[in-house]
Amino acid sequence: MRIELAQIRPFLGDVERNFLKHREIVETSDADCVVFPELSLTGYVLKDLTFELFRYSEKAVEKLAEASRGKCVVAGTIKEVRPGVLRNSAAVIINGEVDYVYKFYLPTYGLFEERRYFQRGDPSRDLKTFQHAGIKFGVMICEDAWHPEPAEALALMGADLILIPAASPMRRLGRSLAIQDSWEALLKAHALMNAVWVTFVNTVGSQEEEFFWGGSMAVSPLGEVKLRLKLFEEDRAVYSIDLEELRRARFFSSFRDHISSFHRVLAEL
């Protein structure tokens, strides 16, 4: 399976222009699957525009499905799950059919105020895997990657690959550790602990007063960065899933030795 990381700068609030950019990339890609960032069809810093744009973004997903021509496409969008209830979503398009993955952890610190606009997904119903080009994969959106449970659950559901659409802005954690260093450490940890390929696709460019740094990357199940996109500018690149590397990683991994009672303890704390 060949995967294209499409690190784009969305036009904030301009769904039609964003759709045209998505369509051009999908139509010119020679990959089996094209992955875009979080909320790539709308832009991230939407605030109250969220309630105006969801109808347009749902129509854009339908048009993108028509243009996908047998490819797998993962695009960031807004989904109305019932009247007036919106979710930060990834549209997963396979052979023209659309399904959705919903964000579980909605950040409310710093610049983030997602709970004001979105309802979180329900893991008991919304956690799912997909199959394409011989690979089983799952999707988790940005903040979900900062918690261990979604990746662990997807791996135990049989995922070979975890895709992470994100909208991560520039910030520093402490005096010297930049956010991109934190993300790289996090992605390597998910890959190593769960013996999966991990693909992170970040937004790039400015939206309102925020600047998104890009730096998308693909990490092997052995914790090696196999592909790294540019910082601070749009970029796109393709890599191939190495199934032999996946087999080697799983031979030396204990990720299936899952002790469910840990989660019962956590639920009671």
Set out the residue ranges of the language-model regions.
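Extreme N-terminal starter segment of soluble prokaryotic enzymes
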Residues: M1-L5
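Cys-nucleophile CN-hydrolase/nitrilase-fold catalytic domain and related Cys-dependent amidase chemistry
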Residues: R23-I94, D99-F104, S168-K188, L192-V196
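Short beta-strand scaffold segments in enzyme catalytic cores
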Residues: A75-T77, N88-N95, K128-F130, V201, ...
